[in-house]
Amino acid sequence: MKQYLITGGTGMVGSQLVNEIKKSDSHITILTRHDQISNDKKISYVNWAKSGWEHKVPQNIDVVINLAGATLNKRWTPEYKQTLMLSRIQSTQALYELFKSRNKAPKVLFNASATGYYPPDLFMSYTEVYKTLPFDFLSDIVYQWERFAQQFEQLGTRVVIGRFGMILSNEGGALQTMKLPYKYYIGGKLGSGQQWYSWIHINDLIQAILFLINNESASGPFNLTAPIPERQNLFGYTLARAMHKPHETWAPSLAMRLILGQMSTVVLDTQKVLPNKIQALGFQFKYSNLKMALEDLIKE
């Protein structure tokens, strides 16, 4: 039986990942910030907001999956920016300190990250070979998060970093936010409309995570995005078609930056990111193009 330790296991990605892992011979320990009782013999919860939580984590953990982190979908006040950073750094460091104090390190760590690692660009295509230093707040979060995760290599753990693109899901996240203006017939171009959206269907994301965990040759950063990214204007048009709604309005960049503040970088300052490394290992995307993904997710 394989032992998993998961942070962020009750979130959008984590909950679906847990349901998939349960299909195998496994036991899953989920770290949460509140007391929770499990009715499933394959799952146990540990409240790591309480002192002594370390002693409740099983000794024989094989796989650590670190998805913990405050949501980006809130206005980035100075206080919340600190929360965004610390929620990722402190949780990763706590996991490292836990296993550093033990004689048995996990075989593999899968640590979430984001395509915000790469600088915004309208023309460049980014693969995993591109390396950079932080250039804005979001890239600094990503850079620090990855750096803290890489400490696990000192313990002999194989470290896999998944740079998530825009996750498309019916359970929340970006797609539900993007659907709202179209629902009320006010969807359209955002800014220039030329910025890239490097997206991924959540089912492909879950399968990619498990593929990388189980592939012993996989290590380092992986772009977890669909093979065919789209520019925002075409993305919006495709979404409108799937919802049988118009795509006719325009929200200027200046207006969006005034309304959203620094959070506007998530929709305006984006990158074209390609999943070359995971494809080279043989991973096959089920939803490689946007039309196919949206038709699966949207039943209007």
UniProtKB/Swiss-Prot annotation:
Superkingdom of the source species: Bacteria
Pfam family, one: DUF1731
Stretches that traverse the bilayer: none
Similarity annotation: Belongs to the NAD(P)-dependent epimerase/dehydratase family. SDR39U1 subfamily.
UniProt xrefs under PANTHER family: EPIMERASE FAMILY PROTEIN SDR39U1, SUGAR NUCLEOTIDE EPIMERASE RELATED
Protein name in the entry: Epimerase family protein SA0724
Organism: Staphylococcus aureus (strain N315)
